[in-house]
Design a protein with these regions (language model features):
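Short, glycine-/small- and polar/acidic-enriched structural segments
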Residues: 28-175, 189-195, 206, 210-213
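Short, solvent-exposed loop/beta-turn-alpha elements that line the ligand-binding surface or hinge
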Residues: 61, 128, 132, 215-225, ...
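Conserved C-terminal helix/tail region of periplasmic/extracytoplasmic solute-binding proteins
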Residues: 310-346
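N-terminal export signals
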Residues: 7-27
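Secondary-structure end/capping motifs
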Residues: 239-320
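Pocket-lining segment of extracytoplasmic ligand-binding domains
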Residues: 178-181, 185-273
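Solvent-exposed, polar/charged alpha-helical surfaces in well-ordered, non-transmembrane soluble domains
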Residues: 57, 79, 83, 97, ...
């Protein structure tokens, strides 16, 4: 059940954000037209709405000039946002929780994903005899970057199965061809990554999947509820000073969300850059079909999503006191609701 406007206003009212939100249907002056969005792994299906918004000209339609800065992982993109080299981050929802725990107020304002779409797989070369999670102890596990959402998923999985993050060695391998090479050459024994990286390795029977969050059902099994994933987030200061800019960004992403749901894998594969395909268009289309459910249909955060994300994060982040996190301040659905009304169809 999505939040109503009244409920959303209640949630964000304490911060004063609601007072600055754009009014639907009235022309609004864009406060900041030139923007940099940081992302960790732009070619990933996880961030497909960002690419579609850029390729289809949705940012341009909103009067924005957007530069996308691509980094090796979500934690690097986060650093760019906090450091000031990017205005907005296209990253994992749970980063807003981590930031609040450190006294930095950031808010997700439009969703690209409604399930993490992260797959944990073991090597059929170095872990051919894998039988249970206990076999991961002492192994090298590849993640897109230390501290990223892939790292978080592995930590949570380890905790669920009686292991600690310190029981394994994490190695950053990125989210592209380098990750595939790391697995094939034996640099790592297991990997938490996304498609098309995972799909590439599965095609050649090089890995075996042991945990999968590409579907809503599997995500609920692993995390205990809906787990919001890719989003656009920015500092509270940025959103408060630039509400019309935030609305324009949300409009573009919601249009992209809906376009993806309305088009088949063939059309999407022809739309994205050839480099996204990792040399195999048929594989990419298979990955699109496997991940489509994980992508948001409307840019909204599910009602139980923030609490699920907080519980997952609190399970392994040292010294993170969930009772001190105000989840009403880590997201707002107001911009996405406005965008959904402005663009009810593709």
């Amino acid at each position: 059940m999505k939040l109503t406007r009244r409920h959303a206003l209640k949630l964000v009212g304490a911060s004063g954000l609601a007072l600055s939100l754009p009014t639907l249907g009235r022309a609004q002056e864009i406060e900041k037209k030139n923007l940099t969005i940081a992302v960790g792994g732009k070619a990933l299906i996880y961030y497909l709405p960002l690419s579609i918004a850029e390729i289809n000209g949705y940012f341009d339609d909103e009067g924005l000039k957007v530069k996308v800065a691509d980094f090796a992982g979500g934690s690097k993109a986060l650093q760019a946002g906090v450091g000031g080299s990017a205005d907005v981050v296209s990253g994992a929802f749970e980063h807003t929780i981590n930031l609040q725990a450190k006294g930095q107020m950031y808010r997700a304002f439009v969703q690209q994903g409604r399930a993490p779409a992260i797959v944990l797989a073991v090597s059929n070369k170095t872990m051919a005899d894998y039988k249970s999670p206990a076999d991961l102890k002492g192994k090298k596990i590849g993640v897109t970057a230390p501290g990223s959402s892939t790292n978080m998923m592995v930590n949570f999985y380890l905790e669920q199965n009686g292991l600690k993050p310190s029981d394994v060695a994490f190695i950053g391998v990125g989210a592209g061809a380098g990750a595939v090479t790391a697995m094939r050459t034996g640099q790592i024994d297991a990997m938490a990554n996304l498609d098309p990286v995972i799909g590439t390795l599965l095609k050649e029977n090089e890995v075996r999947v042991i945990a999968d969050t590409r579907t809503v059902a599997d995500t609920k099994t692993i995390f205990g509820g809906n787990m919001p994933s890719a989003c656009l987030y920015a500092s509270e200061e940025f959103i408060t000073k630039n509400p019309n800019t935030a609305q324009a960004l949300a409009n573009a992403i919601v249009r992209a969300d809906k376009w993806i749901q309305a088009n088949d894998a063939e059309t999407i594969a022809k739309t994205v850059p050839a480099t996204y395909l990792l040399g195999d268009v048929e594989l990419y289309k298979q990955c699109l079909d496997a991940n489509k459910e994980s992508l948001s249909p409307n840019g909204l955060v599910d009602a139980d999503g923030p609490a699920t994300a907080l519980n997952a994060l609190a399970a392994f982040v040292p010294n993170l006191d969930a009772s001190k996190i105000d989840i009403s301040k880590i997201y707002t659905n107001e911009f996405a609701e406005n965008a959904d009304k402005k663009y009810p169809n593709v």
